[in-house]
Amino acid sequence: MVTGETLVDSQKSLINNDTLLNEKLKEDFEENVSIDVKIHEELRRALPDYEESGFQRFTWHIKSWHELDRRAVSPQFAVGSRQFKITYFPQGTLQSAGFTSIFLEYIPSEEEKLSNKYGCCCQFAFVISNPRKPSLSVANSAHCRFSPEIVDWGFTQFAELKKLLCRQAPDVPPIVEDGALLLTAYVRILKDPTGVLWHSFNDYDSKIATGYVGLKNQGATCYMNSLLQSLYIIHAFRRIVYQIPTDSPQGKDSIAYALQRCFYNLQFMNEPVSTTELTKSFGWDSLDSFMQHDVQEFNRVLQDNLERSMRDTKVENALTNLFVGKMKSYIACVNVNFESARSEDYWDIQLNVKGMKNLEDSFRSYIQVETLEGDNCYFADTYGFQEAKKGVIFESFPPILHLQLKRFEYDFERDMMIKINDRYEFPLEFDAKAFLSPEADQSQNCEYVLYGVLVHSGDLHNGHYYALLKTEKDGPWYKYDDTRVTRATLREVLEENYGGDYIMHPPFRSPVKLKRFMSAYMLLYLRKDKLDELMNPVSADEIPEHLKEALNPSIQLAELRRKERLESHLYTKVQLITPEFYSEHHEFDIADFGNAYKEETIPQFRIKKEAKFSEFIPIVAEKLGYPQECMRFWYVVKRHNCTVRVESPVNELNSTMEEVKNVWNSQGEILRLYLEITPENELSSSLTHQNTGEWNAFIFVKYFDRKSQEISGCGTLHVNKSDEIRSICPLLCERANLPKNTPLNIYEEIKPGMVDFLRLEKTFTQSELSTGDIICFEPCRPSALEDDIVNSGFDSALKLYDFLSNKVLVLFRPRFIDQDSIIEFEMLLDRRIKYDDLCIELGQKLGIGADHIRLTTCNPLTYSAGMVVPNDSNITLYEILYSSEEEMPSNVIFYETMDVSLSDLDRKRLVRLRWLVDGLANIELVEAYINKSGDINDLFGAVCERFPDSDLRKKKVRVYEVFESRYHRDLSLRTLIRTINPAATLVGEVVPLDQLQLYPEEKIVQVHHFHKDIARIHGIPFSFVIKPQEKFIDTKLRLAARTQYPESIFSVIKFCVVDFDNNRVVYLNDEDITYDVVEKLNGTLALDRAKKDSKKPNILDRAIQMKN
């Protein structure tokens, strides 16, 4: 038995019935009220920033828990104007055995059901408690946006059954006592000022919701998208961009024209806008679009480029007037009348975040005066060294003020860039006059209003950028996150982007301190007295006509496609294979439905689902130019063997398009048909597409032309299945323009990899040919004119079919980009081709011998180079493509052209030696192919060839082996190459003079490199002489000479003695005796330094360039 009541009902019943108000009930009532207040407060504290539009507590009295069905539903209850009910699974759902499950279900109103677009934002808590002692309970909370997609929400594992049914202590009853429990729901309805609170965005349309559209992300261009949107919303900037002359042929290739097109599309399109054309105008390739860059740097490069486009035009200096202010750097002497000052323009201001509380602190720090005194005095002309004041002061502020917050800084302790996530506040409005020079024009307005916050979310190496922007003078805020634009609250603009820590208060749990990973890094302020000018909307009349003429058709086409997508559920899509299309088809089946590119070439129709098929016929006739009386339609279906063939004629003329589609394809979205064109007298008299009378089978015909080396569609035939196959030979010869009595080979195309030869004396029935089957014919013998073609191509349809079933399109890419070769190319190959033949074809393509090509497989997940393909003539192309352990193959193979043949390579080994030319500051890599039976002396010969002017043969040289940056052993010139571990690094040098003539007690040690932790060893170790009684200050001078590191690197190195075996480190002071510390520790010298000198340049670290 179950009953339910709301908070109001229960309180009224207790208060109005005086006879029940004994002391026990008073206590229960007070305890219940206390719990209700506490839970309501817990919920509000968890989401304090959302305004509540309704709250209700509903208690469901369950008196016989063990008798409940597997799924029980509570009475319906109201929260304000909204209706809810509870769905309870006492023994849990199928996925939550051992738990009890509870869900809150929203009941939409009739109006909401009709609109099918609604959202109800709720925060709720469930409490299961003991009816006699409500404090014995278990609770949990959640929040959800109820919508047509999500009608219920809750907990599959709300509580363990043993926690409900068992005593937690001998004197404590279970929560479910004698089968009774109270299941209480506390439901808060929250206002949704933005319309997207907890939205799934599955059916979200930015244009409809906000009036604005986003920008597509090309991979890592979110930083660019956020900046472009912040510039676009400033109407004055947009107006200037439109006024740049771009109507000349040269102008249409410019960045300015691409930006105009981008802005125009943002203004008038209803879908997210692509930036591909814009980045192409920058001269960027696909790699550039996957590189994260600094927004400030990108902004400056873009503005510089636009300024160049504005020279000698009516908008020259327009950007300067918008974005540029002036500041003065000065040094003023305290005791004499002397000042050195320089005024300069600025486009943005970089403000410190670390150690600052807010924007005002940063500005005060920026203009803080530094005193130059003592050893740091300023040298003034004619006055000598003087005490002085040094600083920066602003002389003017621009109408548009970009403030760059320095969220990314270099940490010298950790020797790396880090993100500063400290809390940093910025206001909606501020007055910059306090930071203006006293000598500047004090009448200028310096009040600014916040119009943009550009945000970085994440850490230094894995982040995302988006923007919060105010698009109108008195309008709301919007969040621009790539393709999506949504309304935003002031809290999202300010508090959520201050950074720092915040306290989360999950209901029924302890508070949790969390760190925000999103923080503002650029602020856009507009000067208050210029708002009307800056935000005056750009009208269509202000846009150049050539831009409208160029873009309006594409916008209209995009809108048409968008409308089609939105209305696609109302239409049936028809793919109609015509005789013309079939005659141009050169693959298996009657069309290639598995190839998206080729599928687009099939004639397409879009017809309302409710339309009759008889209404579809005249539409086809008009579009394709066929007479209706000669048209017969056939269903095209997928057979069990995965081929696509005609099945039967369409007889359902009075059925709807949806009904016709469902005859053979109830699950698919596309109706596929074949259109037969037949003379009127061959159609059935009723013209209602009845079955074809005495013609028992409708056969498709293909012809193999040896001259063109193609199989093509050659029409269709209605045949009597009792006729012999030879009966159609004259007609086939006529269609192929062959002599009437030409002997023919005829095959049945069953499926890829299965083509059968047909015996002409057999009937169609005996050959099991029926409607939709495909036959292919060819002359039995090639003609004299075809002999040369046959010798270099396919001499029969069977061989071409065999190739078609095994062909694969392979993309060949160079293994190393810097090779002087074709960047990449495609080849259509037989997957059974052997390795040697594959290399021959590649060699012909590349103009190089086949034995000078080495192939490498491709990882299908990362598209990076995998394993080198062994030089094995038995390996097939199929085995190379499927060589990865992943189930999916890759159609990419990497190649490299070799200086030596692969056969020589089998006898030789590529050996790499790092030659110390000038200490460790100049290391050259020497590579040589050495016979596997050779020795180090052969390798040394390659070094001498590399450095012919060094006269190395007359000098004492050393070659040594290094493993994982640790010295291993010296190698003599007679050391055999085959004895050297391929994983070792070989290092060579001319032996320093001080190591050739050691004094008594001097010794040579190996010096290693590490960074902070000796486990982080790196670099190339080197030999060094340590001397008795020598202080480290002198040792350091010799180390500088030995390494030849520049001062910028050597000055930051920390020197120490390391015992790697016992993990001990002793850092050296200038007065230490180096020799004694090494002997005492039984260790070696080491340099604690960052791994910079050996770091390869990262292509992702390169500066922004706009090459156009």
Curated annotation (Swiss-Prot):
Question: Keyword Protease, does the record have it?
Answer: yes
Q: What is this protein called?
A: Ubiquitin carboxyl-terminal hydrolase 5
- Gene transcribed to yield this protein: ubp5
- Domain of life per record: Eukaryota
**What this chain does, per the record?**
Hydrolase that deubiquitinates target proteins. Cleaves the UBL propeptide in sde2.
- Name the source organism: Schizosaccharomyces pombe (strain 972 / ATCC 24843) (Fission yeast)
What follows loss of this gene?
Simultaneous knockout of ubp15 abolishes cleavage of the sde2 propeptide. Simultaneous knockout of ubp15 leads to abnormal splicing of introns featuring long spacing between the branchpoint and 3'-splice site. Simultaneous knockout of ubp15 leads to a growth defect and thermal stress sensitivity.
| GO terms assigned for molecular function | cysteine-type deubiquitinase activity; endopeptidase activity; metal-dependent deubiquitinase activity
Enzyme Commission code: 3.4.19.12
To which protein family does this belong? Belongs to the peptidase C19 family.
Record has Transmembrane as a keyword: no
Q: Name one GO biological process term.
A: protein deubiquitination
> What does the entry list under GO cellular component?
cytosol; Golgi apparatus; nucleus
Where in the numbering of this chain does the USP domain appear?
213-528
Q: What is the lineage of its organism?
A: Eukaryota, Fungi, Dikarya, Ascomycota, Taphrinomycotina
Q: Reaction catalysed?
A: Thiol-dependent hydrolysis of ester, thioester, amide, peptide and isopeptide bonds formed by the C-terminal Gly of ubiquitin (a 76-residue protein attached to proteins as an intracellular targeting signal)
This protein's major location comes to: nucleus
Pfam families the UniProt entry points to: MATH_2, UCH, USP7_C2, USP7_ICP0_bdg
